Amino acid sequence: MKLFVFKSKDEFLGIESDYVHRIIDDSKVAPVPLTPESYTGLLYHRGELFDVINMRLLLGYPAAEGSAETTRIIIIKWLDKKLAVIPDEITGMIWIDDNSKNTN
C-alpha cells in the first residue's frame, strides 16, 4: 500500500494515496460561524465544495504561528465523500507492505 504522509505538529499521519485527489496552494477558505476551532471553513475549488479541517487543531495542538511558506491544502476524495485538510508539512510517500503485522 502506498501512503501519502504529512505532519501536524510532532505527529506524522498517512492516508492511502488512492484517496488523495490533489494538493493545492493556499486558497480562499470561507469561515463558517459557530463551528469547532479545527473546522477552518469551506473551500470552493473547481466547481466543488469541500469542508476544510486544520489537522493541528483537530489533534488538540495550538494554532501555528504565522508561517513564511504558503499553506498547502490536501484534497481527499473517497467514494462520494470529499474533505480538505491543512497539514503543517507534506513529507512525501512511503510504501507499506500489506502483509506486514503491526507489532505495537
Predicted regions and their residues:
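An acidic, low-aromatic, low-complexity terminal/linker signal
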Residues: 1-104
